[in-house]
Amino acid sequence: MIQRERLAKDFDAMAQLTAPGEGINRLAFTDADWKGRQYIIDCMTDAGLTVEIDDFGNVLGYKVGKNPDLPVVMVGSHTDSVPNGGNYDGVVGVLSAIEAVRSMTDDGFEHDHTIAVVDFMCEESSRFGAATLGSKAMRGELTLQDLHRLVDKQGISLYDALKARNLNLDAIEHMEYKRPVKSFTEIHIEQGKVLEHKAKTIGVVTGIAAPERFYVTIRGNADHSGATPMNLRHDALCGASKIILGIEEIASMQEEPPVVGTVGVVEVVPGAMNVIPGAVKLGVDIRSISKVARDSVVTLIKEFIDVIAEKRGLSYTIEPVAQDHPVVMNPAMIREIEEAVKSVGVDYMTMPSGAGHDAMHWADDVPTGMIFIPCREGISHNPAEFADMDDIVTGAKILDTVLRKLSLESTKLN
């Protein structure tokens, strides 16, 4: 049985494991992140799991089944955070998975397949500009070149961050997860307002939108702000402002299937009040459940950037960061989750996920499913992020039910 008090205690403990600042601050590979991961390791060990840490820092806890040679039933999420984030994004998935395993142990539940609980490293893109890096590493999608290419705001490369944690950098191109996987399940807060608006307790995810991310650097002339007439300026920030508004407008025009566009990074050089901005770096994030729609919007945006730059006498460069592909959830997994929801007896709806998740990297060749619980007012990536413990417990019960069924050899996903 899922124990509310035990689960609540874990959330309280994780809330204390943060760097100074408002909300939760566990950026990937920082000391706070490492302390959070150590707590997860301790929880896994206390739950009787056999813990392994791979060469990228992903934490895997195994509850061995009666037939260890069968493909593993994988479940997990992440515990790193954005700056000034909340205590539920990702954490719900990891702690609920551990609690589900405890529940099985408490009940003496016997299962055929080994269950693997995973705390994926560096799911958030906040530090290195690319998301779900731990999952990508486990799927063989990261190269040594990527480790050097991805750099944080302090100039620290992903390579150096891994090296500082004594992880095996030379293994990165050979660390693809080798064990066969029967299924992958992730439970997560919705990070939107739909469930709350529809008064539904659970969302059964049908597909995951995926981002294309790139940096745009616009260059003009950093001239004197007082001595340069308006008609002789090449102001990079004014050009960037036009581009930002253009991205909003172009994304809004694509209604079905919808595309969302965000400029979440704006860096101005030299950043002085008496100097016309000479360069601006924009971080652009374009997402959709449809790759075709997303690609169309990205093409229009790049054409628009070219028009603005030429019109204003500016130059620009575009640096790709990530190009993930949207995925659909496995129909058999959707059915298993729906059956579990019905057995618990709560209202649910099927829905796509607008945010990316670790689950998307398993969905191509592993039957994958996701469960959403509501978060208050849809707020996430924010200190005000909140999920009600009643909803967390309900989600954990559903996850427990799903994992028990999947861990039986008699359950076929076809």
Which ranges hold each PLM region?
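A non-catalytic alpha/beta surface segment that caps or lines the substrate-entry region
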Residues: 19-64
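His/Asp/Glu-rich mid-to-C-terminal helical/loop segments that flank catalytic regions of hydrolases
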Residues: 208, 224, 228-253, 298, ...
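N-terminal hydrophobic or amphipathic helices/low-complexity stretches enriched
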Residues: 1-24, 64, 275-276
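A short beta-alpha structural unit
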Residues: 27-29, 262-271, 283-289, 315-334, ...
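Zn-dependent metallopeptidase/amidohydrolase metal-coordination segment
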Residues: 7-17, 76-77, 348-398
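Active-site metal-coordination/substrate-binding segment of hydrolases
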Residues: 41-45, 50, 60-163, 389-394
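Midchain, well-structured core segments that form catalytic/ion-binding scaffolds
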Residues: 122-123, 129-291
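Alpha-helical metal-binding/catalytic segments enriched in His/Glu/Asp
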Residues: 75, 84-124, 212-218, 224, ...
